[in-house]
């Protein structure tokens, strides 16, 4: 039996039965296929069994905007690459660079192509000291975006800018409504804003107002 299996393998190699003839890449929307193929660095003449699937996976996962990868073989001669891309939720403008961040707070360098591809709100800081990657204020601001999106996704989907000015937080909607949240209890105020929106829903929307002020406790000024 062992001899039969060995001979079968030799014969398959001889006729190049398992030579890689096709690569199927699924799930990529932003990351170009040629970038993925370059990262894999494979030889089309090799058998699909000559590759370490774990190494191929690691190589593709090293590409920015790729979150996870599954590599599998389909006999006799196909490699399948299933891609899960990162989904940016905010574009942060820092002094020296622009970064996207996803729900895991992973920084992703934002070039012009990426900015045009991902239509997400921007976050700006106007502070005495410049904000840098890893700063506590940036981490806090990202947590606010993630939590507020979970609480009031309708507002997030209509958001153009998240604006910090010396710790005072303002939101600007796509229709240019300015929502002032002040410098504390921002998440609680998002919940209040959601309730307010439900209250007025039959008659008007938040975009009907040019200005909404929640800086004063237990008050909404429009």
Residue positions per predicted region:
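Soluble extracytoplasmic domains of inner/organellar membrane proteins
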Residues: 135-199
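Extracytoplasmic/luminal low-complexity segments enriched in Pro/Gly and acidic/polar residues
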Residues: 183-222
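Extracytoplasmic
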Residues: 18-20, 31, 64, 74-78, ...
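Terminal hydrophobic membrane-targeting helix
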Residues: 9-114
């Amino acid at each position: 039996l062992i001899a039969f299996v060995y001979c079968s393998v030799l014969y398959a190699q001889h006729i190049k039965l398992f030579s890689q003839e096709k690569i199927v890449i699924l799930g990529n929307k932003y990351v170009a296929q040629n970038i993925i193929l370059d990262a894999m660095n494979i030889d089309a003449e090799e058998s699909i069994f000559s590759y370490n699937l774990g190494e191929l996976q690691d190589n593709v996962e090293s590409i920015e905007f790729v979150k996870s990868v599954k590599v599998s073989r389909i006999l006799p001669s196909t490699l399948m690459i299933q891609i899960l891309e990162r989904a940016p939720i905010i574009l942060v403008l820092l002094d020296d660079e622009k970064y996207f961040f996803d729900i895991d707070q992973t920084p992703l360098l934002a070039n012009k192509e990426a900015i045009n591809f991902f239509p997400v709100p921007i976050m700006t800081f106007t502070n005495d000291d410049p904000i840098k990657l890893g700063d506590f204020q940036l981490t806090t601001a990202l947590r606010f975006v993630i939590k507020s999106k979970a609480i009031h996704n309708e507002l997030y989907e209509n958001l153009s800018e998240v604006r910090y000015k010396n710790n005072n937080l303002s939101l600007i909607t796509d229709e240019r409504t300015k929502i002032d949240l002040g410098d504390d209890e921002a998440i609680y105020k998002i919940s209040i804003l959601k309730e307010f929106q439900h209250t007025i829903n039959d008659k008007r929307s938040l975009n009907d107002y040019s200005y909404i002020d929640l800086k004063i406790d237990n008050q909404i000024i429009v």
